[in-house]
Amino acid sequence: MCIRDRYDMVQANIAIVDQARNGTGCAIVHSDDAIGIQHLNQEASKALSAGIRAGFKISKARAMKWITSNPAKAAGIYDQTGSLVIGKNADVVVWSKNPFSVYALAEKVFIDGGLAFDKKSNYFPSSDFDVGIISPNKNRIEE
């Protein structure tokens, strides 16, 4: 992103899209970044705050749709995922606080119906999420 792009950006853009078509817009908070995608709740919170500052009346429940049901609708898979409904696929995060708070921590994460993370557990599986593909013949620490 160049400096000019930063000056030209509209911080309330997500809220503006949300309010399009008489409040039926399909706003989406997304990230192309491996780290940013882990903080979509915080990005949605920033977008919600920018929208409120711009004068839009948007509830936290509506803003939550920006990272849940709206992306599923946009991808054409809302009949399969995007909301907690019997018969749909869903991963669930149990938060310690309001998920729009920077102080919120994931307490538990359920993926495909199974407990994948529990903050109270001593077991923390390692992940190559932000490391990338590792050569199977090398040790990542020595690379």
Task: Map each language-model feature to its residues.
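His/Asp/Glu-enriched, well-ordered alpha-helical/loop segment
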Residues: 4-95, 104, 110, 115
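Extracellular/periplasmic ectodomains of large secreted or surface enzymes and adhesion receptors
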Residues: 19-22, 111-143
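Small/polar (Gly/Ser/Thr/Ala-rich) solvent-exposed segments
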Residues: 99
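Short, solvent-exposed loop/turn and secondary-structure capping segments
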Residues: 105-106, 120
